[in-house]
Amino acid sequence: MKNKQKVVVVGGGFAGLELIRKLGNSKIYDVVLVDVNNYNFFPPLIYQVSTGFMEPSAISYPFRRILRDKKSVRFRLGSLEKVVPSENKIILSNGELHYDILVMATGAESNFFGNKNIEKYSLPMKTISDALSLRNTILTRLDRATRLQKAEDRKRLLTFVIAGAGPTGVELSGILAEMSSSILKKDYPELDREDLGGIYLIDGQKAVLSAMSTKSQKYTHKKLEQYGVKIKLDTFVKDFDNEKVLLSDDTEIFTKNLIWAAGVSAKTFEGFHKESYGKGNRLKTNEYNLVEGYTNIYALGDCALVLGDEAFPNGHPQLAQPAIQQAENLAKNLERKDDNWKNFAYKDKGSLAIIGRNKAVLDIPGQNYSVKGFLAWLIWIFVHIMGLVNFKNRMRAFVDWIGYYIHRDQYFRMIIKPKEREV
């Protein structure tokens, strides 16, 4: 026990959680997990929290509960502020920690591309806090619209612009379209169909789901338009002043709702060499996830730019699977002798996106084959239920989905605004 090395893992997302699971009962390492939240959550489903289809507890779970049977792991609540490699320590918002090995698994944050107005006024969707804020905003504005006299004022409150037509943007636009067609008329009889200003999906690429196959793109585009979603491609959001969205083609959309799903960048921290950062502020690593310029600092997941994988010379996609696989490989390497480490090589297991009820798309890698419709939807549900952290979360998610599927209704449309209090 006295000779154990201390591994500090910063970030408890897909990569960080997988690493501590693998090293949780290690005989050669003591592990400390650091996170700004005291819970892990499942990012692919936060859009369902933001629209009231799921409760936050269905996709989140306390770290300390997860770590109960991990004898070699301890949890530290705190926010990373600075790295001091020369002293093998990190500075947190509430103290400091020393390490023998540091693993950065800090994920990514919304990228506003330097636009201060968009950063200030738009509605991001990266965290559970973001999702609850978006849910409160949507429901508050729906309620406010019932009291407005002018049709143009109601329409501005009930027009939604979603920037980014990746899986998050597609899934959110689809679920908002389902809300407008099946729920609003039942719960808001004061509003007419004409009061709903529309749902716009904006993207600078030439197709929705640009990372997926052409078949999946065309199917998704067609189904979203059938839902009534207005899609504008090869166009990006230029500015937003909380009253109207200005697009790159100089089109203006009058709305108070710009939902930002248009890209991410890794977080940066004081203490790293500038040369260690690459594209998207990701830490450049070798094929073992070792950060360039350091001998005992590693990076995993969204914050890592792995330059040693020949199949992905520009780095891996910032998705769950690369993060999990990197963590698995690093955990095995840390348990091996130094001369027996294995390179990381990403194995693509496919891509999924849900569009709406009974509609989803699946691309199978290496087969040039796509699945769409009801079967893809069932696969999407299975994959996402199994991706949740434990059985209790899986059951909650399953019950929530079954309830909506049978009743075509959302159970979690409550406006809950926590009171700020100094702790």
Write out the residue ranges for each language-model feature:
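A Rossmann-like FAD-binding core segment of flavoenzymes
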Residues: K71-K82, A177-E287, G293
